[in-house]
Each structure stands twice: as structure tokens, then as C-alpha cells.
Amino acid sequence: MKLIIAAPSPYARKVRVSLQEKKIDHEVIVDVPWNKNTLTKDKNPLGKVPILITKDKQHIFDSKVIIRYLDQIVPNPKLYPNDYKNELSMLTIEAIADGICDAVVLIRLENVRVNNLISKQWIERQEEKIFNGLKYLSKDLGSKNYFVDDYFNIADISAFTSLEYVDIRFKELDWRKEFPNLDNYWKFHNTRDSFANTKPSSQKIDPITY
């Protein structure tokens, strides 16, 4: 298998963590989907990462679909549960975590536009989403080490990934001070091999002039 990613992408990281948890052999290909010479557009009509290329050359996207696929071909460890109640809870945490990442991405893209096109109001709107999303995660987590059903699953992959993405893209938000239980949660999971082996890194993208 081959996995096309952007180095800082939290969505790609979710897939990378899942692949490592399931011990599936794969090759990682790093791309910059925002740049003109990206190879991503040839693999996904939306021009987005991650993209999983299977041994039979099938292209699978986005992260949620890929991880569902991985759960089918390698059932253990199970990342999405079979029972409806727990699945709904996990999907809700995943949606909140992905929404936090979406807002961080939008701020990042706004900040790389030329100065006279940057909208402070747009950025403030995204910052509000991030804070409210973290507040929701904090309340839902409470004093637990896992979000749903006391075992590691897609909710934890999504939540942890979103916390570290906020760290690298939105450093001025001191979420650890604001939400100490999320900090404790981060410390509990930070040494997990699949997280330690998939730390995100920054990439340079072309300036946005429109």
C-alpha cells in the first residue's frame, strides 16, 4: 500500500496512526496539495489528502473512508465499534476533532494570503470554533483516559491528533492551561508508539493571491 500525505496534515496522521496500530505495511509519499505541481489532483478529484493506493491500484479517500477500509481488511484492533451507541459517541468525538482541525486549516490558509486580503473577522470566527470544540472535548472527557468505552479507538486517534495540530498551527492558544484534563489526556497517550512515530512537521506552501 501507498499513502499520500501532507506532512502537517492531521487527517493524514489519523490514517498513519491507524496503519501503525494495525501493523499494516505501507509506503508514505509526502506531497504539498496546495502547490501547483502537486500529484494529489491526479489521485483524488478534490485534490485533498490523505489518499490510500491499494495493491490493486484502487484510490481510497478521505481519512474516514480509509480507516473504515482498514478496519475491514484488518479487523483487529477494532477502531470503529460494532454497536450503535458507542459508534455514535465515537463519531461525534471524531466530528468535533476534525472540525477543530478544519478551523485551524482555514486560519493557516488565511494567514498565507497576501496581507491586504486577510480577514481578521474570518480568523476570529475560526478561533471561536477551535475554543468551543476543545471545550466540548474537555467536558466529554472528564477525568477519563479514553473518550469512549475505556479502550483506544478512532475517538482517541482523532482527539489526540487535533490537540497536537492546534499545538503546531495555533501556538498562541494555551489549551493546556485552559483545559488541564486535556493536557493530562495528552500526557497519557503521548508515548504511544503510533503517535510518537507520526509527529507532524511543517511544509512551505505557495502564497495565496486571491
Functional labels for PLM-detected ranges:
Residues 176-210:
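Long hydrophobic alpha-helical segments typical of transmembrane helices together
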